[in-house]
């Protein structure tokens, strides 16, 4: 079982400068390596305060120079918003400067707000994503490639800086689509999934969807890696827990607004947080998620691992305006106590 950090780089208000958010995110990635996490993932979003990282590859390249062993991943490159031939060149370059530590997460995107500002029809995102992934695979595997598709025409093209990892860096697809999951299994890619703030029942349903997708390609679930994105927090301090839950719910509210075009902003940038009918109470979130005392978090993680059987759990660390020093202590706590305890319990169960 691997553990990763997922770093969103959110800004909850102007009391946080954008520079401080980015610096805090980088600091969390560096500490993630020191604490023993296998991977640090960076999101991609645009034009608002939900997330301040416009290019996760830039974050990977920067953090590669500040770390030495941790894997560094894009979670995710939103393919319909890219020229794939340029993205290919950047992927090769970043894997080289990261000494072969790049984990390449890709997805189709979901925020209408972003697509409108790039002039891309979000209804066509799945088809554009599929074609872009075709192009990435050609460019990564072939010395010279061409492409003729519905959305793009590319003459014979060579990428000058090739990835160190052959034939490609590990590719992770973020999706809730069974069709896209099936493609991942067919082509040997990994999956990045989430149950949002739901509990074991949703994780069980998710396991069934993945199993069906794998089976449709004659595969077993274990034939590809599965990473679960999860909000987790361990503490005996009720105020800390409430602050983490509050920031997690803040992020979810903004995500839903950006997806459903309900976003409101007085200045065109900082989105107003609005309650929604999908909001969960703090008590429900505590019940559903690995949140609470150290023992409660360990026990809950083991339950969730038993249901979903993921290969990796990526915990959300940079949410809203949660206190940076407190989160750094939390990352250290995972390295000191939670990860070793979970690994020990899993080792006993497998023996």
Curated annotation (Swiss-Prot):
Q: Which residues form a coiled coil?
A: none
Q: Does the keyword Protease apply?
A: no
Query: What Gene Ontology terms describe what this protein does at the molecular function level?
Result: monooxygenase activity; oxidoreductase activity, acting on paired donors, with incorporation or reduction of molecular oxygen
Which cellular component appears as one GO term in the record?
Answer: cytosol
- Keywords tagged on the record: Monooxygenase, Oxidoreductase, Plasmid
Does the record bear Oxidoreductase in its keywords? yes
Q: What's a Pfam family this protein contains?
A: Bac_luciferase
* Family, similarity comment: Belongs to the bacterial luciferase oxidoreductase family.
Q: What is this protein called?
A: Uncharacterized protein y4vJ
């Amino acid at each position: 079982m691997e553990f990763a950090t997922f770093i969103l780089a959110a800004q909850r208000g102007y009391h946080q400068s954008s520079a401080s958010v980015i610096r805090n995110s980088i600091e969390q990635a560096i500490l993630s390596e020191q604490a023993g996490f296998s991977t640090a993932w960076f999101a991609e979003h645009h034009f608002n305060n939900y997330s301040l990282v416009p290019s996760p590859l830039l974050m990977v390249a920067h953090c590669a120079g500040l770390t030495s062993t941790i894997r560094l991943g894009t979670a995710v490159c939103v393919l319909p918003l890219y020229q794939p031939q340029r993205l290919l060149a950047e992927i090769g370059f970043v894997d080289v400067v990261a000494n072969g530590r790049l984990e390449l997460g890709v997805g189709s995107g979901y925020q209408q707000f972003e697509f409108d500002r790039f002039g891309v029809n979000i209804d066509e995102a799945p088809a554009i994503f599929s074609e872009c992934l075709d192009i990435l695979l050609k460019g990564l595997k072939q010395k010279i490639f061409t492409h003729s598709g519905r959305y793009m025409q590319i003459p014979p093209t060579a990428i000058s800086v090739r990835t160190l990892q052959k034939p490609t860096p590990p590719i992770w697809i973020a999706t809730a689509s069974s069709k896209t999951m099936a493609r991942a299994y067919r082509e040997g890619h990994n999956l990045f999934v989430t149950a949002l703030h739901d509990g074991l029942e949703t994780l069980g349903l998710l396991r069934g969807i993945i199993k069906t997708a794998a089976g449709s390609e004659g595969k077993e679930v274990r034939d590809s890696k599965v990473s679960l994105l999860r909000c987790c927090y361990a503490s005996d301090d009720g105020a800390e827990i409430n602050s983490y839950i509050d920031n997690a719910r803040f992020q979810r509210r903004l995500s839903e607004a950006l997806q459903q075009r309900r976003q409101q902003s007085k200045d065109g940038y900082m989105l107003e947080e609005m309650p929604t009918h999908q909001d969960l109470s703090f008590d429900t979130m505590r019940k559903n998620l690995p949140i609470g005392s150290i023992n409660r978090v360990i026990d809950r993680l083991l339950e969730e691992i038993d249901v979903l059987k993921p290969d990796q759990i990526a915990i959300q660390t940079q949410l809203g305006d949660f206190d940076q020093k407190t989160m750094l202590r939390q990352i250290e706590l995972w390295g000191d106590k939670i990860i070793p305890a979970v690994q020990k319990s899993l080792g006993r169960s497998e023996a």
